[in-house]
Amino acid sequence: THYVDARTALKNSDIYSIVYQLSADLADGKLKATAPRAQGILNNPTKTSNAHAFWQSMYAQLLLGGECFAYRWRNDNGLDLYWEYLRPSQVQPFLLEDGSGLIYNVDFDEPEIGPMQAVPQGNMIHIRLMSRNGGKTGISPLSALSDELQIKDQSNKLTLSALARSIMAPGVLKIQHG
């Protein structure tokens, strides 16, 4: 089976449209927590964008890649200050040797932060959509679209080829009835 990456999938207008609509609809939903502090971070998770944009990014990545990540920046007392969205390419999860949980290696874009090794799972938001390995990682729904996208790609190539070989008349043919 051929792997479909998110960049390729988003060039397909149908996939782009459904991912955009679903992620926007999910981001419109209200996440509820019982503790006021937890509700505060859910309502305002990041310093770099509004809550809707943050959650739409998280849900879009979840729909495209099967999982999404955010780092939990905390104060000295362990209380969440804000969350930072992370691309999957910035995060590598590892199972602890005793199997009791996960740790993460995280590469931040900011040079002053740099890479962090062995980040405990309590410092990460890691949402997974289905799994084949007991919940360690998620499965991309795009893997199910591999054949369909290959067929569509070949159909598009055939159509473009046929159009390129079609006869282009340089003028207009006039017929006089007589």
Q: Which residue ranges define each predicted feature?
A:
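Structured, contiguous alpha/beta core segments that scaffold functional sites
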Residues: 1-178
